[in-house]
Amino acid sequence: MTRRALLVAAVAVAVAVAFADSSIVVLALPELYARFDTTIEGVAWVITSYNLVLAICALALVLVVHHARANLLLATGTLLFLAASIACALADSIGLLIAARSVQGLGGALLLAGSLPVLGALGGSTARGIAIWTLAGTFGAAVGPALGGALTQLFDWRAIFVFQAPVAGAALLATFGAHVAAILREGWRPSLWRTVPGNVALALLSGALVGTLFLGVLLVIDVFGLTPIQGAAVVSAIPAATLLARPLAAALPAAVAIASGAVLLAAGLVGLAFLPSSDLGYTLASFALCGLGLGLAVPGLTHTVLGGEGGIAPKATLTVGIRHLGLVLALAIGAPLLAGDLVAGADVAKLNATAVIIDGEIPATTKIPLALDIRDELERAPKGEIPDFAAAFEEAGAGTDDAVQQVHDDLVETIERAVTRSFRPSFLFCALLAALALVPILVFGRRWVA
């Protein structure tokens, strides 16, 4: 591999990590919740702070990016990202972690704003730079939860940020090897207004991805009871399908690929909304549909928005800000929606659990103490998590009595079904966002999709 290729790879990986950071800590949230004295809302800010700060800073940078050198933007961003990653790994309180994640968001905005012109310079052309930047960003967004889950399971949550530090360091070194001679004097030109329909579609698709990258991950961990690395294996269907979509996208007209991607993403989210309890095969298929949709729609849409006349730096910065703004707004709506549905789902689960025990073919002398133990376990379990009934059923004789074991199996299945259904409205909300993305794609597509 040539020196130039190594420099391109270093910057591309940094771009992928900056996009992955939107969701990379999702599978680590249970460990963070247990590690720090905080609330569920506090832990959620570990995700929200990064995305919110990145969105705000990227949108603000659109107004000033034409006064800066791309090398300087990239170097400053990677340096901040590097320092913030180390601070995240060393954080000993939830407040410090959220503050460090906010600085990461600022660094990510600068990194992503400067990386595209640098990739164009290193790659030999603007078109090649756009292609590399788009592919890295799409794959990074898709692989985030799986990568974070694997690192959390193999080491602990701090490993997520330890891993990011050398990536940022390599990108920082790469900035000194790129030669972007001119200052990016590319203000808010008319060409930026022509990207509005495409950016609206990207914002809606990014919001829809909340269902896949956040809600779907929480479902397989908290409801299905998978470990972080098992969850990582399941959600790895998303980046795998995203890569598989690449040759298909190349073979289709751009407008067809983008519209098909939005439809497939919506279909995958509808599939997640109607999961038949903890069916991993059905879940994998739904994740794969979402990944195919992501791979077909987002790269083509991003490439279209960034192409054409006008400077790429302002357009890339605007696109980054809009994408993360869509994600933050979807989180702001979807998270409270899910929280309310989980409370209602917990009540339904208790009623259904009572019915299972009453209908069970076991003696009344076993039912009464078992029902009391089950009630206590349900009260103690966090909303959205399936309690561990093993001890209660072991005491009731599940190891030797097939009837008691059958009640246990029926109970777990009933509660899983009730809690899984609690996710349905949130998944359908995200599917609606993907479907709404078809409006700018179909209405304005002929004007800006080649």
Report the location of each language-model feature:
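Transmembrane-helix bundle of Major Facilitator Superfamily
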Residues: M1-T175
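Hydrophobic alpha-helical transmembrane segments
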Residues: G77-L82, L106-L116, G137-L147, L172-L184, ...
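Transmembrane-helix exit segments and adjacent C-terminal regions of multi-pass membrane proteins
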Residues: M1-L7, G207, T365-A450
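12-transmembrane solute porter fold
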Residues: R4-L29, F36-Y50, A55-H66, N71-L74, ...
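C-terminal membrane-cytosol helix-exit motif in multi-pass small-molecule transporters
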Residues: A165-E186, A437-G445
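Juxtamembrane transmembrane-helix termini
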Residues: G177-L184, I221, L306-G310, F444-A450
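Short extracytoplasmic/periplasmic juxtamembrane "stem" segments immediately C-terminal to an N-terminal membrane anchor
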Residues: A349-K367
